[in-house]
Structures are given as structure tokens and as C-alpha cells.
A protein has these predicted regions:
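Short glycine/proline-centered loop/turn elements that form peptide/ligand docking sites
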Residues: 76-78, 174-183, 216-218, 240
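Glycine-rich phosphate-binding loop and adjacent beta-alpha segment
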Residues: 217-253
Length: 253
């Protein structure tokens, strides 16, 4: 089968090589999926640049791709949640990526059936982003009835985070470009702030949670709008000793 693989890490010129490898076999708990679509997201670029090799030291060449959509072609003996012909999607385990291929062998617990209202291409954009947001809300201990500030609500991650947060019963405040305000409010945001005309650090305070999708200087600004004991989860920032010192946090935290 054809696959797209990393053969070297390169920070400046991300290149994948198309090659042929054997079609994967499956274990008793796995599903063989014939791939119809695959998502491309920043994590794929980070892997290509070698930015996660300290966490997951991939052995090159490595087939790329984290998000997969496809049709179940065969199932393992102990798989009881799928049947041949099901349309499925999933976020592949970080240590077993490989969605940029004609087929993938996946643990059945890493997959779900695709809702009929999603096309294959639409479904391919969901797993990694949605699971990341769910993990962030779990880390916060997010509780219904409390308030969350989601930075960059007009972006792809923010656009996914808003309806998920609302489904969990949270009050959502977000910001972004004013020309997208109507779309963001239609996603369920309770309050939208146009960053060009309003400084949220002056008009928002005492929020319970912050989901930082921007990083950089915005992370520190968002710390200032939380109530004491609030929780911030950043999807972009890389905290270090200098950050801890500026924010009066212990370095081990």
C-alpha cells in the first residue's frame, strides 16, 4: 500500500515521501480501516520538525498522520463494537500514528462511528481537536454553571471548543476578529469580544477557567482575568522558569 512518510526531521522544509509498504495485519482487538480521509494539523508539522521526539522518539521512516476516517475492512476476533462496512473516525495513538496511508490497523477503542451528517473530510477535522479540548476541560475540572474564557474563538480550535464547553453547561466568553462575531455567537458563545475594539483584560475578570489557544504574551494576560483558584490550560504556551517567576508561581508547578 502507499503511505506518506517522514524520513528525516527538518525544521525548515517539511517533506513527506510517498512509498510502498506492506498492508498492516491486525490483532484480536484491532480494526483494519481503509482510509478515505485524513486530517492535517499543527501536530503533524511539529512531528515533522522533530519537536516531539523527546516525548515520542519515532523510529524513522515513520508514516505520518494523526486523524483518520475510513471504512472498516476487517475486525479482530475480540472486537464487538464495529462491523465490516462501518464508517469510522479516530485520533490514532501518539505512539502508533500513520493516517497518511491507504490502510491503518487501529485498536477498536480508539475509533467511533462517523455521524451521518458529517462528510469524510469534515469528520477528519474532528478527532484530535475535539479530544484535546475534552482533555483540557477535564484537566480544569470544569463544572457546569461556571464561566470559561476561550481565547481565539474565531479560530479552528476555538470554534470547536465553544460548542463542547456549552454542552458541558459552561458560560462561554471568547474573543477574536469582529467580522466573525455572528458565527461565533451562533456556535453558542454567551459573550463575544472584538479584540480590535475591546481589551478583555479591562472588561473581563473573575472567570473560573481559561482555555488558551494562542500562547505567547496572551497566556500571561489571560492569567490576570481568572479568579483566585481558577484554572488555565494552554494549548500553545511552553511554561519555563522565567514564566513562573513573572507569574509568582513555583517552578515545579
Amino acid at each position: 500500500m502507499k503511505v506518506a512518510q517522514h524520513t528525516t526531521y527538518n525544521k525548515n522544509n517539511i517533506t513527506l515521501n510517498i512509498t510502498e509498504i506492506a498492508k498492516p495485519s491486525i490483532t484480536d482487538k484491532q480494526v483494519l480501516v481503509k482510509v478515505t480521509a485524513a486530517g492535517v494539523n499543527p501536530l503533524d508539522n511539529m512531528i515533522s520538525r522533530g519537536e516531539v521526539k523527546m516525548i515520542v522518539p519515532y523510529k524513522l521512516p515513520q508514516t505520518a498522520g494523526n486523524e483518520v476516517v475510513g471504512i472498516v475492512e476487517s475486525i479482530g476476533k475480540k472486537v464487538d463494537n464495529f462491523q465490516v462496512g462501518n464508517r469510522v473516525f479516530g485520533r490514532l495513538p501518539l505512539d502508533h500514528i500513520g493516517a497518511f496511508a491507504e490502510y491503518v490497523a487501529v485498536d477498536s477503542q480508539a475509533l467511533a462511528k462517523v455521524p451521518d451528517y458529517l462528510s469524510d473530510e469534515e469528520a477528519a477535522t474532528v478527532p484530535l481537536t475535539a479530544l484535546t479540548i475534552m482533555q483540557a476541560l477535564d484537566l480544569m475540572g470544569a463544572q457546569a454553571g461556571k464561566t470559561i474564557f476561550i481565547s481565539g474563538g474565531t479560530g479552528g480550535v476555538g470554534g470547536m471548543a465553544i460548542p463542547i464547553a456549552k454542552a458541558k453547561g459552561l458560560k462561554v466568553i471568547t474573543n477574536g476578529s469582529g467580522d466573525s462575531a455572528e458565527r461565533v455567537l451562533n456556535l453558542g458563545a454567551d459573550r463575544f469580544i472584538d479584540y480590535k475594539t475591546e481589551d478583555y483584560t479591562k472588561t473581563v475578570s473573575e472567570v473560573d477557567y481559561v482555555l488558551d489557544t494562542l500562547g505567547g504574551a496572551e497566556t500571561e494576560k489571560q492569567m490576570s482575568i481568572m479568579k483566585k483558584g481558577g484554572h488555565l490550560v494552554s494549548l500553545r504556551a511552553m511554561p519555563n522558569g522565567a514564566f513562573a517567576k513573572r507569574m509568582n508561581l513555583p517552578k515545579w508547578k
